[in-house]
């Protein structure tokens, strides 16, 4: 597992400390794995591993844009698998994407099949730093938690993050949540989910705090089943409340959307 990096604890010793790995200003291209994690595989049987994938202020190549592409994993099958995590598979691990202001990390290419450069697993992903993270692969087999605490995350491929939060929701249906934009603790930051002219459905709760923004470009659509938004929803795209769904728009700017709001 792990075509480029394997951060794994196969030790059953419960006293084994959690690991911490920093991956800074590093591009991953053309990596393959017969198992899981085409570029990166991380899992632990004890405490979660902590992985920091960062682009700092010093990165100047390609105008400050770092691109990870053409990574794939087969999951011990006959061909590439989204469930295996073409770019990364994270089990009991917490991964932070820390992108500096004015820098961009692009994972995947929309011209490739979505299985290439996919992210899968049940861990936790946190976006920090005021820079941009662009996800262009099919990440529907990522069922862990995702939090955008600072900066922008752009979804470049339709229906590519549908099942975020599913693992937690299966374990605790009474406390079910999916993707979170903004936070109470990091209220001084500005966090944004940017949906270009693509179509996205979130099965579990999409939650926005006061410092969170959901931008939906013209031609784009976001379908929500549950959750609430206390921040800003903007853009010329469409927000759809799914049939039998329930969504609370609580922010003063939550109706800044110039496109349609549709209730199925």
Regions found by a protein language model. Name each.
Residues 12-17, 27-38, 42, 47-89, ...:
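Surface-exposed loop/turn positions within long extracellular repeat scaffolds
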Residues 3, 20-21:
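Extracellular beta-propeller repeat domains
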Residues 104-108:
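Bilayer-penetrating membrane-interaction modules that drive fusion, pore formation, and translocation
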């Amino acid at each position: 597992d792990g075509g480029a990096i394997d951060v794994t604890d196969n030790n059953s010793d419960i006293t084994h400390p959690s690991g911490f790995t920093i991956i800074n200003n590093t591009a991953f291209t053309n990596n393959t794995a017969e198992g899981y994690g085409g570029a990166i595989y991380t899992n632990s049987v004890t405490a979660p591993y902590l992985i920091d994938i960062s682009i700092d202020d010093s990165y100047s190549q390609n105008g400050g844009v770092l691109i990870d592409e053409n990574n794939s994993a087969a999951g011990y099958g006959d061909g590439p698998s989204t469930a295996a995590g073409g770019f990364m598979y994270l089990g009991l691990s917490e991964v932070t994407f820390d992108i500096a202001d004015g820098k961009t990390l692009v994972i995947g290419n929309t011209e490739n099949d979505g299985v290439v450069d996919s992210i899968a697993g049940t861990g936790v992903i946190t976006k920090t730093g005021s820079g941009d993270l662009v996800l262009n692969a099919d990440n529907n087999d990522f069922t862990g938690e995702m939090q955008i605490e600072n900066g922008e995350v752009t979804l470049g491929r339709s229906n590519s993050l549908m099942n975020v939060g599913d693992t937690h929701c299966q374990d605790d249906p009474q406390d079910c949540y999916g993707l979170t934009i903004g936070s109470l603790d990091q209220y001084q930051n500005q966090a944004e989910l940017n949906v270009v002219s693509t179509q996205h459905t979130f099965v579990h709760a999409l939650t926005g705090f006061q410092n969170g923004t959901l931008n939906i470009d013209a031609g784009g659509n976001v379908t929500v089943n549950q959750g609430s938004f206390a921040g800003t929803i903007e853009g010329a795209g469409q927000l759809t409340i799914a049939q039998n769904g329930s969504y609370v728009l609580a922010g003063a700017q939550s109706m800044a959307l110039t496109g349609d709001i549709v209730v199925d």
